[in-house]
């Protein structure tokens, strides 16, 4: 039943994603982070105290998320096993973000194909932290491909990995870790101290999923008839061409698979950030590379699901 729950949840994400106004735990986690952050900032003012407060905030948010998830699942199962199973499916469904990511990428792609650069810049600004107001079409394409490649890890592969390790409650706890990093894990002055622990622990949580993405995306590239060998080669060669210890694994794999170059300089919060290039520019990046990257994401996520199911069946059976 557990394996079936995984498959149904994955299919639900693939088919419908997160409907608008649907009750979503990530919103509740975000509200908890905001409330906890306000308390920390009220009592902590020095960098040292903010770092300690940030660590406490991380423990509270991740601990509460895991405990509530476990408690809700246990209570639902006590009411009726089938009800518990449905709640488990819902929890797993909410931690997967494949359809949401694909739709967000398509929202940028459509106006770009229609020649509406202003609209594509605006839609892009909803999913990236960089300044999009002056981006040219090639830069918009690059930003979308990078976003899909990077979020293939923390939106799909990592949640499935933690689901495999500890069931729906641990997958929910990972989502809290990832949301903390998204909200406070920045390097600029406002968040550097309070978000230090969140940023570093998110890096640690994604160590294995990021490296798995290199292998899975390389296999996906071969299955999609892109360049699987170059995905493997560039993914390894350029794996450290990023300030994050994890992001370049998936981005470099996609760059190699498609024969394009990612990375480079970008503007964040009014500051120019110089980043190393990832991949080799065998050709210029195009709007079609957005669709290709989405395809790679779906194939890699299918492979991840199959891998974790196979390992679980080998270890404990299909129950």
From Swiss-Prot:
One MF term in the entry's GO annotations: threonine-phosphate decarboxylase activity
Membrane topology category: Multi-pass membrane protein
Subcellular location: Cell membrane
Domain of life: Bacteria
GO cellular component, one term: plasma membrane
Keywords on record: Cell membrane, Cobalamin biosynthesis, Membrane, Transmembrane, Transmembrane helix
Single GO biological process annotation from the record: cobalamin biosynthetic process
One Pfam family hit: CobD_Cbib
Transmembrane segment boundaries: 55-75, 78-98, 153-173, 296-316
Cysteine-cysteine disulfides: none
Predominant location category: membrane
Pathway(s) the chain acts in: Cofactor biosynthesis; adenosylcobalamin biosynthesis
Role: Converts cobyric acid to cobinamide by the addition of aminopropanol on the F carboxylic group.
HAMAP family in the record: CobD_CbiB
Homology family: Belongs to the CobD/CbiB family.
Entry-linked NCBIfam families: cobal_cbiB
Protein name, entry field: Cobalamin biosynthesis protein CobD
The organism of origin for this protein: Citrobacter koseri (strain ATCC BAA-895 / CDC 4225-83 / SGSC4696)
């Amino acid at each position: 039943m557990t394996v079936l729950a995984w498959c149904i949840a994955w299919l639900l994400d693939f088919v419908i994603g997160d409907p608008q106004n649907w009750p979503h735990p990530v919103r509740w986690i975000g509200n908890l982070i905001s409330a906890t952050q306000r308390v920390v900032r009220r009592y902590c003012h020095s960098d040292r105290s903010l770092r300690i407060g940030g660590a406490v905030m991380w423990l509270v948010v991740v601990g509460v998320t895991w405990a509530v998830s476990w408690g809700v699942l246990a209570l639902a199962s006590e009411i009726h096993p089938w009800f518990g199973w449905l709640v488990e499916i819902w929890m797993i469904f909410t931690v997967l973000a494949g359809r949401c990511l694909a739709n967000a990428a398509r929202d940028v792609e459509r106006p770009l194909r229609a020649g509406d650069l202003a609209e594509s810049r605006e839609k892009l600004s909803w999913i990236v932290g960089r300044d999009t107001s002056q981006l040219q079409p090639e830069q918009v394409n690059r930003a979308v491909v990078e976003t899909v490649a990077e979020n293939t890890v923390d939106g799909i592969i990592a949640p499935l990995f933690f689901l495999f390790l500890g069931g729906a409650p641990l997958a929910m706890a990972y989502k809290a870790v990832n949301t903390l990093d998204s909200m406070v894990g920045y390097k600029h002055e406002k968040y550097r101290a309070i978000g230090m622990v969140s940023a570093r622990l998110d890096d640690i949580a994604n160590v294995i999923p990021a490296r798995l993405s290199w292998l899975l995306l390389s296999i996906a590239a071969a299955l999609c008839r892109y360049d699987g060998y170059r995905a493997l080669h560039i993914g390894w060669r350029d794996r450290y061409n990023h300030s994050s210890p994890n992001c370049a694994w998936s981005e470099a794999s996609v760059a190699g698979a498609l024969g394009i170059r990612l990375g480079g300089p970008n503007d964040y919060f009014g500051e120019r950030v110089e980043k190393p290039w990832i991949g080799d520019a065998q050709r210029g990046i195009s709007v079609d590379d957005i669709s290709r990257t989405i395809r790679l994401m779906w194939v890699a996520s299918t492979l991840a699901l199959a891998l974790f199911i196979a390992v679980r069946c080998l270890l404990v059976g299909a129950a």
